[in-house]
Amino acid sequence: MVKLLKVARLQFLIVGLSLYVLGALVAVVLGAPFSLGRLLVGYLVILPAQLSVHFSNDYFDVAYDRPGGPTLISGGGGVLLEHPELREPVKWIAIGLILFSIAVGIFFIRIYAFPWWIMGFVVLGNLVGWCYSAPPFRLSQRGLGELCYTFAAGFLVPAMGYLTMRGALDTGGMFFLVPLILYGLVSILSVEIPDMEDDRLGNKRTWVAVRGRGFGFMVIGWLLLAVTGYFFFFHRFYPRQLPLDFRIVGYLSLLPLLPGLLGMIKKPAEKQPAAKIATWIVITLAVFSIFVDGYLLYLASRLL
């Protein structure tokens, strides 16, 4: 059981939860009624889907894991290298989690009378997570892994949170999803930076494996600058008044921007210093999301 929990990488669930809650709180702040039941049942769609990705990635990528290779933010868990007898159970756990996610999605739509097109999001999210590393698709080896991760983590997860409260994805929701999509791309590029050598050995055509760590840090830096600029300036062009102070969110976005700019300036080529900066970028992205959740929760509590 302990070994399977290591494969699950429970620490990464915090990011998924915070993004889901962020989407839900944005909907409430924009006027949607709050429902604890919808919030909890909706998360039972997201949680198994995210866990399934952790299990399926370890199962299909075991050939590319290296003993001692994993870092805090990247690399396989290493469990299946040491315990190959767990490979089949891990595969079936991943499949079972997908089926559970879809079943809860159907239950959610039936009990809360939501439109059935939302099931398209649920099925698509699970399909993308499976195809990320599973043959014959193996999107992570075809230069498509970044787009898949960005779509799933940066768009689908917070969008599902928004949908559970509002029941539709409107202009207000999309306005908030744009920076989260960019942050999703920052996150996956940061995770790829420590894995560059192993990905090249495994013929994974990740953007960092193909173009190098310097390229990864440059893209990350520009994306983080774009998000901070978005929070400080772009909201002025939104057609109606929004009930929050974007300067606060902009200041919070400086948390991931600072290590991002450090990586952009230094562009370390060696694994150890590069992994250190990439780790800080991922950690500060998570902290940013949690702090924004706190701010939105404060605003929502004043509206309830």
Where are these regions (language model features)?
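Intramembrane alpha-helical segments
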Residues: 2, 77-168
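Small-residue-rich segments of transmembrane alpha-helices in multi-pass membrane proteins
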Residues: 17-23, 147-162, 208-213, 277-291
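Membrane-embedded alpha-helical segments that form the functional core of polytopic membrane enzymes
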Residues: 21-22, 26-62, 119-130, 170-190
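Helix-coil boundary and interhelical linker segments in multi-pass alpha-helical membrane proteins
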Residues: 24-44, 103-119, 157-178, 232-245, ...
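Functional transmembrane core segments of multi-pass inner-membrane proteins
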Residues: 29, 33, 149-200, 214, ...
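Acidic (Asp/Glu-rich) catalytic motifs at the cytosolic membrane interface
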Residues: 48-74, 185-208
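Multi-pass membrane catalytic core of lipid/isoprenoid biosynthesis enzymes
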Residues: 68-113, 205-240, 284
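Extended hydrophobic alpha-helices typical of membrane-associated regions
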Residues: 233-304
